Amino acid sequence: MLTTVVGSYPPLLKNPSSFSDKISNVFGTYDAYKSAIELAVKDQVDAGIDIISDGQVRDGMVEIFANSIYGMTVEDNTPKIVGKIMPSPKSICANDLKFAIKVAEGISIEYGQKPKKTLEGSVKGVKGIVTGPSTLVFSSRIEGYYNKKEDAVIDLAYALHKEAEHLERAGAAVVQIDEPFISTGVVDINVAKKAVGIIADGLAVPVSMHVCGEVADIFDELLKFSVDIADFEFAGIPANINALENVNLHGKKIGFGCVDNKTDRIESKEEVENLIKRGIDLIGAENMIADPDCGMRLRSRESALSKLKVMVNVAKNF
């Protein structure tokens, strides 16, 4: 069974220590986040994860896009929509993705393989991640241009489609769209579906959508979105697994969250194994990709790494 992560990893920044780093720091060119990306990549590869991330160490999932997309800004830690939304003139995340690929490939050449349209067999790579348009809009205060949130969602989808294309060109093995707000009930699911379809349109690599939270009531609708992988949490929200009974997957794989990201407690091998077996009984191992419930940014490094190792040790047996 393939393994992946949802995205974020504990961001451990490093002060400049070498002479060249100190000189760079004097001139304001030292990037403290590169060491955090490197650590996140090394830990994920060390744990045996197949499709890793760059760790999303730079900023919150909303702020990193709100600071870069035309028509959006962040003021006093509040994301805002202040004008007509347009794509960023340059990629927001491609440089970190390319650096992560370089680091991973330096550890194992497998992570440098050419991305494929399907995730079959033995696949290694780095995923590119965008925060979904519905989540960005419903996390922001609208102060200009838009009277309807739905219109902002669609414009953001077109802007994020450009970013997804940047990530694909940068070597992403998967493009993932994070849409946690869909599970809250405040988002128009039909608008969200249209927006995700706009982002995914024309991409030559697999597209994944992550929706955390309880999704049993909307599960069937989420499986109609134009993505190849639908990712949910099953460890922290056991009720979600009931939605897998007699489900029509519409040809999708399920990202099967099987370790809880909300606690530092490290699951036993038996816990993870029993949960994955329940998923296999319902939809089959061939339709599953094992991953944590959600991002691991708030966990300690020791907990995050240990959880990933337990998960991989179980998943590789299926």
Residue spans of the language-model regions?
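Domain-level signal for soluble alpha/beta catalytic cores
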Residues: 1-318
